[in-house]
């Protein structure tokens, strides 16, 4: 039966201890059985993740190789040539927007691709630190709760606090955050598609030294608009607002020169739209710097390689965890024997590492077998190494 008690010397920190009866053998066995089912589903999912990741990797490589072999670099971004219609083109140039983006509530008006208003509210935040221990045959959890006031961009729900009294937050913000996006964005005389505009996401904070406070009760300090009686000693519920931009465009302004971007996309008259490759993938690339066509595709290959290895590791980790869940029942059977349970736990961990590594390499090999047979063969040989090592360690010694 569970119970709890509190202790603490201040309103901003307290300790809560919960206790419950130690589970019996049959209860632990029942939980382990449920874990086996979850482990089985995760085990199957890891195979799917690993196999499809290899297919995605090869398809992306083929797409990038095809794109590099077909791309045409444009030297003049102000004169779209008819002979390039339908082709994959590469160009670099400064961003241009036809109309400024503005926030009339704060007097902000700028020629940028994206204008972001970020609102933060001064609120109570709860922190907890727990430790488990056993006492008089009961399993107990001691949780230390502490509270602090901080600026947060989202409403912190104080109703979920362990102790809301004295730490209550407002349920909403009087001013909301938002992002405004320019409808028409050009590089030279080329109009960017929505997909290309979405890729412009390097935000920079706007310095407010050249702006004035829109209202008497709003103070500008440290590049924030403060909705506060005393911004140096704020109260819970006070707001502060900052502005950020991405894709500076137009002529020279106090923010600096317009940003330069590099684009690889399909030319359709004076529009830049997605390019459909023979492999079925879409090419629509944008980098917020000046790059050659070769540099663009090198960066894409590097990103593809990084994603591939990240998903391989995720698949291996998922497989290892699933094997641990499925074999935990063996540990449960002996967890009441102090010495044996530690040895079994170590053995199951080593077993899980070996099997997960071997099956991961085999799955990767199967994913590559139709594309790179030699690589698949090498991976198959490597996959057998952990199993052979594990078997050699457990092979009975001959007298």
Segments (PLM) and residue ranges:
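OB-fold and OB-like single-stranded nucleic-acid-recognition modules
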Residues: 2-397
């Amino acid at each position: 039966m569970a119970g709890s008690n509190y202790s603490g010397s201040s309103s901003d920190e307290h300790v809560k201890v919960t206790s419950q009866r130690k589970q019996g053998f049959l209860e632990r066995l029942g939980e382990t059985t449920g874990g086996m089912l979850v482990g089985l589903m995760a085990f199957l999912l890891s195979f799917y993740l690993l196999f499809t990741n290899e297919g995605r990797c090869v398809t992306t490589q083929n797409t990038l190789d095809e794109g590099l072999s077909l791309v045409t670099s444009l030297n003049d971004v102000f004169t779209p040539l008819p002979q390039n219609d339908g082709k994959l083109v590469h160009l670099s140039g400064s961003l241009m927007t036809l109309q400024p983006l503005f926030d009339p509530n704060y007097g902000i008006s700028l020629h940028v691709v994206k204008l972001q208003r970020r609102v933060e509210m001064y609120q109570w935040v709860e922190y907890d630190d727990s430790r488990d221990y056993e006492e008089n045959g009961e399993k107990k959890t001691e949780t230390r709760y502490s509270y602090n006031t901080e600026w947060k961009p989202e409403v912190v729900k104080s109703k979920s606090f362990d102790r809301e009294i004295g730490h209550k937050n407002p349920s909403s913000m009087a001013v909301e955050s938002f992002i405004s996006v320019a409808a028409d964005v050009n590089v030279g005389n080329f109009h960017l598609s929505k997909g290309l505009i979405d890729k412009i996401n390097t935000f920079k904070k706007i310095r407010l030294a050249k702006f004035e406070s829109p209202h008497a009760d709003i103070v500008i300090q440290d590049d924030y608009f403060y909705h506060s009686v005393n911004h140096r000693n704020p109260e819970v519920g006070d707001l502060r607002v900052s502005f950020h931009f991405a894709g500076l465009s137009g002529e020279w302004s106090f923010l600096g020169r317009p940003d330069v971007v590099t684009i690889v996309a399909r030319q359709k008259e004076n529009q830049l739209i997605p390019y459909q490759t023979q492999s079925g993938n879409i090419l629509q690339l944008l980098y917020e710097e000046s790059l050659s066509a070769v540099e663009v595709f090198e960066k894409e290959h590097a990103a593809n390689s990084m994603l591939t290895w990240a998903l391989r590791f995720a698949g291996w980790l998922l497989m290892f965890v699933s094997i641990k869940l499925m074999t935990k029942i063996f540990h449960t059977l002996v967890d009441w024997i102090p010495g044996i349970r530690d040895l079994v736990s170590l053995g199951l961990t080593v077993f899980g590492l070996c099997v997960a590594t071997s099956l991961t390499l085999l799955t990767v090999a199967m994913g590559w077998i139709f594309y790179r047979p030699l690589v698949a063969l090498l991976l198959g040989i490597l996959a057998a190494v952990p199993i052979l090592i594990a078997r050699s360690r457990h092979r009975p010694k001959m007298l």
